Amino acid sequence: MECRGTSEREAGREQEREEEAEGETREYNPYYFGERSYEHWSRSEHGRFKVLERFSRRSELLIGIENYRLAIMEAEPETFIMPSHWDAEEVFYVMEGRGTITLLHEENRESHEIKRGDIMRIPAGVIVYAINKAKNERLHIAMLLHPISTPGHFEEFFGAAGSNPESFYNSFSNGVLEAAFNTPRDRLERLFERQKKGEIIKITEEQIRALSQTTGFGGGRHSARSNEPYNLLQKRPSHANEYGELYEARSSDYHRLQDLDVDVSIANISERSMMAPSYNSRATKLAMVVEGRGHFEMVCPRRSGDSRRSEDATEPEGQQRVRYRTVRSEVSRGSVFVIPPGHPVTAVAAANENLEVLCFGIRAGRNRKCYLAGKNNVMNLLDREAKQLSFGAPAEEVQEVFDAQPESVFLPGPGRRRGEAKRRQPSVESLFGFGGF
């Protein structure tokens, strides 16, 4: 296994420079992160661990989430993930596979079975190890990390290890180690230098059975099972129709999310379908593609860089002040799209392929999701006079457009509408004054 270090970080920086050079030839989109935005901290034939670049490094527009990081862990079948702890709070979601995870904290050891759809909170400083017990399926986990020491930076610490990964015990002086363990130096050296196989290693069926038998509590005092995972996919969907399903977990569902002010959701959008345009009142959503292909479209205030007027500058009377631009990104497995609060956004699944999207919501406690099309379109709440004054059209015409979409949350996508016979419908272009976003 390759250990993260100077050479890999230099390779990552070189890759970023290449990506920046390529980016000069296309419109800048600070909200999209592709495969090249990840840095591999470790990888081998048995698994890999990669971390998305810091959000604030990409753009000052994302400085509000600079103290959050995303990462992905993949473990091949029948493998053991070495014990370690983070200087960060963690929430993870199991995207694929099943296994056993064990937590060590204070005088307790607790183990839990994990499977696809599970959400779990790992407190900072808790030692964690895991196994992928499947014979032919990867264990694929997405992680949201909230560093507690240096904003935007976190580290992994290995104690029960050797030379690869390096045990932090090796960094203490010989005298300190001999006194701490009451053991001669030569025995300590043999112990802390023996493991050289890497952070994820292959194990036997017998070892899997032994490690799987630890489910429950042991090794000390028993306490409430507060760290149990919560399965998002086993609850009733918040919304479902032939065009998609939405599953959401808030702190009221899984109380371990409450102090982090985070929520977790999964949207499974059927092929050639879309989520209705919507915005979040206060949460920033970190959307990661679990499976499938499609694209995101988001409306952003238009920024003119150095030519931007100062905030106290006034516009001539009657001149348009607010302008928007659309950022569009093709997405596939592992792609990340950041959705700031207030920004209208939609996701569209490709033809012949569903689009499954995982969202971590930050500052989610009092968030409200406002849909902008469909039966639950918030604009339907405008009174008659407000509709007429706002759109400059008769209220009946406005309402006719709003009522034309009978579905909510998940809708037929652009491709599906083109492929179906269209009934006579009111003109959206005439109402909004343009042909599209």
Placement of each model-derived feature along the sequence:
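Conserved metal-binding segment of the jelly-roll/cupin
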Residues: 77-78, 114-134, 269-272, 328-352, ...
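A short beta-loop-beta micro-motif enriched in histidine and acidic residues
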Residues: 62-68, 78-93, 257-262, 272-291, ...
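Catalytic lobes of large eukaryotic enzymes
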Residues: 290, 296-338, 356-404, 408
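An N-terminus-focused feature that recognizes amino-terminal "leader" regions
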Residues: 1-252, 263, 280-281, 359-361, ...
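N-terminal domain-start segments of secreted/luminal proteins
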Residues: 94-96, 101, 256, 306, ...
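Structural motif
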Residues: 98-100, 293-295, 354
